[in-house]
A protein has these predicted regions:
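Sec/Tat signal peptide C-region and signal peptidase I cleavage site
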Residues: 18-22
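Acidic, serine/threonine-rich low-complexity disordered tracts
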Residues: 23-126, 164-266
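Hydrophobic, well-structured mid-protein blocks that either form specific transmembrane helices
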Residues: 118-160
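Bacterial N-terminal signal peptides that target proteins for export
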Residues: 1-9
Length: 266
């Protein structure tokens, strides 16, 4: 379960922005999808022998704060392995971002992870005016309207999916591991999905993944999000280097809108 929360956040990045160029519609979107106080819990299941085992969970929370005098959304992703998996690989990860409420662009990104005793800390300050990101490891050029791995989730929840047709390929840029990554997602369409939480009307998409420790490159991941104004991630399925994983939304609090995509609970 190496890179646990990073992997979960990477899974959630499928919600990132839509534009023919990462600079047109990608910029300037206002937040209408979430409010401070929202809390969402995802549960991770791991499968190697045909049986899914609960391996851990990740929570995503938001609050309203000021950062360097700017009104900001403080969004935090926390991941941990369950005690059973701690015996194999203990994970205690924390990712957070401060998002400018006026532009929905990240101001500050912090990564503080402990994975199997291997600790990583990275602190990134974004300067969109000069097109640079100053991280713990150096200064890097960034593209306009770039997102970090947490801000992307909240930014993209404000996108109108109805304007896209099946198989549309939608590019976006993301700053991750001190690099600008040029990615895309493919819009598949709308369908009903059954999760461990319940049955939903959903939107299905496939992200392009970067080949890494856990995930194979390409479009092998499937993601379902709620077909309502909240655009919550409901389910993620993907093969990994050994076996496959499934991630389900299991709890939510303080959504801005009723979860009207929910047909029934289990």
């Amino acid at each position: 379960m190496k890179h646990f929360i990073k992997s979960i956040i990477t899974l959630l990045i499928i919600l990132t922005a839509f534009s023919l160029k990462a600079g047109d519609e990608f910029c300037g979107i206002k937040n209408t999808a979430f409010v401070p106080g929202e809390l969402v819990t995802m549960k991770v299941y791991y499968n190697t022998m045909g049986l899914y085992i609960a391996a851990g969970e990740a929570t995503f929370s938001t609050s309203a704060e000021k950062f360097n005098g700017k009104p900001s959304y403080h969004c935090i992703g926390v991941g941990k392995s369950y005690s059973f998996f701690d015996n194999f690989f203990k994970v205690r990860d924390r990712y957070e971002t401060y998002i400018d409420t006026a532009t929905m662009l990240p101001i500050k990104f912090i990564r503080d992870v402990n994975e199997g005793g291997h600790k990583i800390y990275n602190n990134v300050t974004f300067n969109h005016g000069t097109g640079t990101a100053v991280s713990t490891n150096g200064v890097y050029k960034i593209s306009s309207c770039i997102q970090d791995v947490v801000s992307a989730i909240y930014y993209a929840r404000n996108i109108n999916f109805d304007k896209y047709k099946a198989n549309d390929k939608i590019p976006f840029d993301m700053f991750l591991d001190d690099e600008v990554n040029h990615l895309y997602l493919r819009y598949i369409g709308k369908e009903t999905v059954k999760t461990r939480y319940g049955k939903f009307h959903s939107i299905k998409i496939k992200p392009l993944l970067i080949k890494g420790t856990m995930f194979e490159g390409g479009e092998k991941m499937n993601v379902w999000i709620s077909d309502d104004p909240n655009h919550l991630v409901l389910r993620i399925e993907s093969p990994i280097s050994v076996g496959n994983i499934k991630v389900d939304m299991m709890d939510y609090k303080n959504l801005k809108y009723p979860l009207t995509s929910l047909i029934n609970t289990r």
